């Protein structure tokens, strides 16, 4: 990829899943146009908007006004913000709101928020009336480049993260890049971890481009739109090849096995660790573990660590505030990972930058020894 110098321009990424194909629109001003974009694609004229207490005061009125202008009747539900909202209790609250609004199969549930709202709303949309239409309006960088695309929905339980859910593809994704201007630096950095992930999976040129252009991505404009579009295209390619995560789609979990265990270890307390930060630490650990297994050069892990550290992300377990439980407890969380098959641990490892692969024969003893070595005791 070359340096981006042109003015911001809207981008469209098509996810070609046959009859369930959908568009991802990326650019400024999309919330104001949401009603028109939805009306041209969906037959229904009712929508239930699900959002949270942080997003609602900023964007809910603009979205509902846009829906009204397009002739779409809407209701809204405002939920508490944070990872703990991804629960059975709140899932039932969303389902009740959707049914109370008499949303039918051709009508839509609209997720206005970050990954938590998208995952929760998508789950409800997938099970109410055995499936209603679903529109994602992601308001964080992380949700724009990752969780809003691909149809994975779910909630957390005390057993772990995202262990209960369904696949339910959206009918449209509206990634309004203007909303990113209201994110805190911490939130934006957390989303950037998922952007970098796509380069580390199988696009080394993209990772190198990010190393050279990350400041322009952070400052906005054309480079930001280009990075989001490239990320969405990368995810679309993987989803189309393996929609149900039976094979190569597991690559999208690079850094997530370690990251999810760290999130569980912090009780999903966003004051200590948010998802993207867990992924950043997890990606560094995945590269270091690959080096430990003589699969990759230690220089690759150092390069990943250096870039993520440069943009301000945590890269070590010791960067997480407060005490962590022992390595054995982290190991228990890893054993609950949804990629575990027949009791065998499955990790996304790497042979170098952009050379990730699925390893389903990783010895538990090696993982535990590695965690003990990296644990900030």
From Swiss-Prot:
The keyword NAD applies. It catalyses: 7-phospho-2-dehydro-3-deoxy-D-arabino-heptonate = 3-dehydroquinate + phosphate. The keyword Endoplasmic reticulum does not apply. Pfam families: DHQ_synthase, DHQS_C. One of its GO terms (cellular component) is cytoplasm. Binds 1 divalent metal cation per subunit. Can use either Co(2+) or Zn(2+). It is found in: Cytoplasm. SUPFAM superfamilies: Dehydroquinate synthase-like (SSF56796). InterPro entries: Dehydroquinate_synthase, DHQ_synth_AroB, DHQ_synth_fam, DHQS/DOIS_N, DHQS_C. Keywords: Amino-acid biosynthesis, Aromatic amino acid biosynthesis, Cobalt, Cytoplasm, Lyase, Metal-binding, NAD, Nucleotide-binding, Zinc. Its EC number is 4.2.3.4. Zn(2+) binds at residues 194, 256, 275. One of its GO terms (molecular function) is nucleotide binding. Pathway: Metabolic intermediate biosynthesis; chorismate biosynthesis; chorismate from D-erythrose 4-phosphate and phosphoenolpyruvate: step 2/7. One of its GO terms (biological process) is chorismate biosynthetic process. It is an enzyme of class 4 (lyase). NAD(+) binds at residues 115-119, 139-140, 152, 161. Its main location: cytoplasm. HAMAP family: DHQ_synthase. PANTHER family: 3-DEHYDROQUINATE SYNTHASE, 3-DEHYDROQUINATE SYNTHASE, CHLOROPLASTIC. Catalyzes the conversion of 3-deoxy-D-arabino-heptulosonate 7-phosphate (DAHP) to dehydroquinate (DHQ). NCBIfam families: aroB (TIGR01357). This is 3-dehydroquinate synthase. It comes from Rhizobium rhizogenes (strain K84 / ATCC BAA-868). The gene is aroB.
